[in-house]
Amino acid sequence: MDYLPMFARLEGRPVLLVGGGEVALRKARLLLAAGARLTLVSPEIEPEFAEFAGRFTHLVERFTPAHLAGQLLVVAATDNLEVNALVYQSANQLGLFVNVVDDPKRSSFIFPSIIDRSPLMVAVSSGGKAPVLVRLLRERLESLLPRHLGGLTELSGRVRDKAKQVLSSISDRRRFWERAFASNTLAGLIEKQDWQSAETWLNDGLDKAQSEVGEVVLVGAGPGDPGLLTLKALQQIQQAEVVLYDQLVSPEILDLVRRDATLVSVGKKAGAHSVPQEETNRLLVEYARAGNRVVRLKGGDPFMFGCGGEELEVLAAEGIPFSVVPGITAAAGATAYAGIPLTHRDHAQSAVFITGHCQKEGKEPDWQQLAVTQQTLVIYMGLMRSEHIQQQLVSHGRSCTTPIAIIEWGTTARQRVLTGTLAELAVLAQQAVSPSLIVIGEVVSLRKQLAWFGEKSGEKRDVQAGTDMNGCDLKLVNLA
């Protein structure tokens, strides 16, 4: 860190500005806006300084070190390098903070680029290394930060003391303010400059805050690549006080959770269910009843084979407020990163997503429907039952030469794609690791042309031939 960011209160404090040109005019405008008691030293000044008449002292003379007496800050804004150097050296000897415009080496402080929503201020600086980049960032921030933020900040200051009296806990106050600032109702009142109604709304919210139940937001984390996280999902995980997350949520996405949030792993893995669903349901209710803003973070989309609906049923029965933020499901994300389109005019007019897990009481899906051609079949969590899936599809008419792919860790740096035919599915599944997605259909053949993401290609090996009832050679797993 080359510079320590800090905000200086200059109201009524003495500041010396050396120079009278356009650059000095810009600095004068900024310093006077901050309330500085400004003294300007320059033989000549721009006519535009007239707009500040009566607000500064103009000494019509050349700079000498004597001008520094009693000053708090010094700014040199001339086009004379010798004068600027003299200002810097003289101020430095007296231990004064000095800025030489556009000369970081001769500045003990610098002016950042400012986004002004007074009293809310945002400052951006590159330490003088990349002013164009700073300007672009400032323009972006200006467009992102609504104009009503200043009024909202003023209003918050008026209610702050009452919030401390009503809510003794820091976490309770933080929760109250986060919800208030995220409220569309409050934002609407501020935008209309209806300050009285806005203040009433905040005070009413404080009166209710102590007895408030929290809320749960069901958030889809997408297939793994943090760049595929939706903007709304990012906002929710950065506002959450408690995050209950699944096994499939990538570490890169968990790194985006705010640092003081409580992280609770409720992950499950095939063959090793570490947290029962009932316990997850209990935790959701418990944390929400304690008044927390809870995010239930699930890989992919929360309503796609993720028990999202079941969890919301529990919350609804318990009277817990909830909302849902959809995510990109693995079937869409992983196939795209593998270069496999789910539908294609020549190869697939439909796509079907199923889970490889057994249904209740061993009920089987409609294999006849799943085995039709010109259809892409995507199977979640299907590795452990791959041999059964293979046999059922072939026995119901799906060709054993149908192209298939198994995508491991789709959309992440660990992505690997194993390809082959339906006859080889069971053996390829033995070579794959979870989490994996099975894709069956003619569209897989397009991967040779369309693969673009830097995954490793899988190789077929240790394959043993068998024969099914239709005479199709199936490569089955040798368990001997």
Curated annotation (Swiss-Prot):
Alphabetical list of Gene3D superfamilies matching this protein: Cobalt-precorrin-4 Transmethylase, Domain 1, Methyltransferase, Cobalt-precorrin-4 Transmethylase, Domain 2, NAD(P)-binding Rossmann-like Domain, Sirohaem synthase, dimerisation domain, Siroheme synthase, domain 2
Coiled-coil boundaries: none
Q: Looking at the Swiss-Prot or TrEMBL record, what is one Pfam family this protein matches? A: NAD_binding_7
Active site feature = D246, K268
Q: Specify the pathway.
A: Cofactor biosynthesis; adenosylcobalamin biosynthesis; precorrin-2 from uroporphyrinogen III: step 1/1; Cofactor biosynthesis; adenosylcobalamin biosynthesis; sirohydrochlorin from precorrin-2: step 1/1; Porphyrin-containing compound metabolism; siroheme biosynthesis; precorrin-2 from uroporphyrinogen III: step 1/1; Porphyrin-containing compound metabolism; siroheme biosynthesis; siroheme from sirohydrochlorin: step 1/1
Positions of region (Uroporphyrinogen-III C-methyltransferase): 214-480
The terms under GO molecular function for this entry are:
NAD binding; precorrin-2 dehydrogenase activity; sirohydrochlorin ferrochelatase activity; uroporphyrin-III C-methyltransferase activity
Protein's UniProt name? Siroheme synthase 2
Q: Which of UniProt's keywords are assigned here?
A: Cobalamin biosynthesis, Lyase, Methyltransferase, Multifunctional enzyme, NAD, Oxidoreductase, Phosphoprotein, Porphyrin biosynthesis, S-adenosyl-L-methionine, Transferase
Organism classification:
Bacteria, Pseudomonadati, Pseudomonadota, Gammaproteobacteria, Aeromonadales
* Phosphoserine found at: S126
Q: What does the function comment of this entry state?
A: Then it catalyzes the NAD-dependent ring dehydrogenation of precorrin-2 to yield sirohydrochlorin. Finally, it catalyzes the ferrochelation of sirohydrochlorin to yield siroheme.
In the record, the note on similarity to other proteins reads: In the N-terminal section; belongs to the precorrin-2 dehydrogenase / sirohydrochlorin ferrochelatase family. In the C-terminal section; belongs to the precorrin methyltransferase family.
Q: Where does NAD(+) bind?
A: E22, V23, P43, E44
